[in-house]
Amino acid sequence: MLRLLRLLLLLLLPPPGSPEPPEPPGLAQLSPGSPPQAPDLLYADGLRAYSAGAWAPAVALLREALRSRAALGRARQECGASCAAEPGAALPSQLLGAPHPVSGPGVWEPLLLRATLRRAECLTQCAVRRLGPGGAARLRVGSALRDAFRRREPYNYLQRAYYQLKKLDLAASAAHTFFVANPTHLQMREDMAKYRRMSAIRPQSFRDLVTPLYWAAYDTGLELLEQREAALALPQLEEALQGSLAHMESCRAACEGPEEHQGAEEEGEGSQGGLYEAIAGHWIRVLQCRQHCVADTATRPGRSFPVQDFLLSQLRRLHEAYAQVGNMSQAMENVLSVLLFYPEDEAAKKALNQYQTQLGEPRPDLGPREDIQRFILRSLGEKRQLYYAMEHLGTSFKDPDSWTPEALIPKALRERLREDQEKKPWDHQPPQQKPLAHWKDALLMEGVTLTQDAQQLNGSERAVLDGLLTSAECGVLLQLAKDAAQAGARSGYRGRRSPHSPHERFEGLTVLKAAQLARAGTVGRPGAKLLLEVSERVRTLTQAYFSPERPLHLSFTHLVCRSAIEGEQEQRMDLSHPVHADNCVLDPDTGECWREPPAYTYRDYSGLLYLNDDFKGGDLFFTQPNALTVTAQVRPRCGRLVAFSSGGENPHGVWAVTRGRRCALALWHTWAPEHSEQEWTEAKELLQEEEEEEEEEDILSRDPSPEPPSHKLQRVQEKAGKPRRVRVREEL
């Protein structure tokens, strides 16, 4: 415990001279010299003014709320740095492992607590000077408001208020700032398109007011390197690295604030046990938060996953750029810094040998960058404590770094952590393309033919197959969809305008709803049975074609019809279904696809089985990740299946249906059995129950004393049980 508390106080000391993060552009202080007001009150007043249509007061209050929130973070970081640099702030030598430490039980305790009290006094006085009396407590906000600021919601209100005030350039800046962090926000996507069509708005107004500047420097540096302008790229890359380290310091300073752990303490996690248990619990949460700052710094706004080895990637580019301009000493510093992360990195060792050869003489004075050495030593010290707590106190810790030496992890934890990393690798690995011969050997069903393979469709893991349905089977399923739509007013499942286009009507039917309607006599039972049989037919073929080594499970089955609304098709410019991927959020601007909600991340393969072709438009098309360049197009017809992997390698959309009614069976498959479609099983059981009841009725009809109808009805109701809830999801 003594060693743990020594390290605790050592790591509480941030490096002196930490750079101060700049205030976000566009948030100039509205009341110079005065301490900030409570951000929660300012934000609430701003929303009230917004709701009342008082646009100018709303703008002033919302901007002041943002400034006040930023002021607290700056004050906390500056106070931490200044208190650590004060004379006498050093810890007593006895707590730092001096050659002759104080002996005796409890002798170290007064020294530890005295140092803690002095630091607390310094931080409190600094907060009073920066924020006013009681400022730290007054400016504390709850988790809901912190989340709102993290999602940049104030900028959503600001853009609307600026628009009402006819300040279009400011509106565009606020809208762009919100959209960067919320790229899937459909309303803001439409608003951004409108702003870009306005000639009065200058192109430079579409700027992010919040994103740390190091991202812009990083992107600029990469672009210059691609253009082989290493001399111009170096200042940008250095700025990006220093900005990344400064952002990490700001994030770490925020970890020491009480509000970051308020939620855990409210749930009682930090209030159990005595003094030392409370200290250890709070300190562990601080360390967990600090370690997460690596991922926070490496995560672009609007993304949920960080850039892998972000600092390391910057160091690699720096040593290569310095070598290109002939600065071998700086190149050696940066490549030696790379080797601090991965000592056995072959590419880095090879580059180091080249640089040493070009220098011509040994340079013992050259070593890794000091800022990177401090970062690694501090990070390893924190990891060591977290793994100790994980082993002995039962806490949790997810290491954000892949470079952590295995020797640092206690042996008792290594196997457990290795098992956790090996769980469900298909959740993270994209499907691998298989040879063409494999595709042709997978056609097992009689009458099914391969019309186009992945190569002919200009992509990977996509195929078009014909012959899965006869014309009679297509007719049965089309009649099922028609009967279900006509029964919509009675069943509560009426058609409605498409969620993807106001110019089309959308009708959907799940397998369970079809079975329920069939049991009620609203639709024919043959159609409901065929829907189940066909979905299993598609699953079997998709598994044989794409995934013979691993079972696929139906995840969701949906019979969908889209009908063109008459009189609303002239000069139509939209799509029936916008370009998207099925298991990840597609970002056309960067070409990346993020496997995260709201996407159905557990989907692995998709299928579209078409029922008709007597309509205009409605072709399926695949695009490049930019969602603009069409790579392949497929015309629907009865019995044609388009099957493909569900990830970002297969962005797709549907052209507008401008006449007629387009019907298809949409199916999604998963490798994860826990995400298999439960409604499919329920629908099958429901139809089997009905068959059994009909057989029993046939037997009873030959019985001289049949059961009274009232008793029969009661028995059927008891057997059916409670009505099942129907999930209705708007799918392709």
Swiss-Prot record:
Cofactors demanded by this protein: Fe cation; L-ascorbate
Keyword Repeat: yes
Localization of this protein: Endoplasmic reticulum
Bias (Basic and acidic residues) ranges: 676-687
Start-end of Pro residues biased regions: 15-25
Residue ranges of coiled coil: 674-703
Region Disordered, annotated ranges: 15-35, 676-732
Keywords per UniProt: Coiled coil, Dioxygenase, Endoplasmic reticulum, Glycoprotein, Iron, Metal-binding, Oxidoreductase, Repeat, Signal, TPR repeat, Vitamin C
Main location per the UniProt record: endoplasmic reticulum
Entry function: Part of a complex composed of PLOD1, P3H3 and P3H4 that catalyzes hydroxylation of lysine residues in collagen alpha chains and is required for normal assembly and cross-linkling of collagen fibrils. Required for normal hydroxylation of lysine residues in type I collagen chains in skin, bone, tendon, aorta and cornea. Required for normal skin stability via its role in hydroxylation of lysine residues in collagen alpha chains and in collagen fibril assembly.
Family, similarity comment: Belongs to the leprecan family.
UniProt-recorded name of the protein: Prolyl 3-hydroxylase 3
Protein encoded by which gene: P3h3
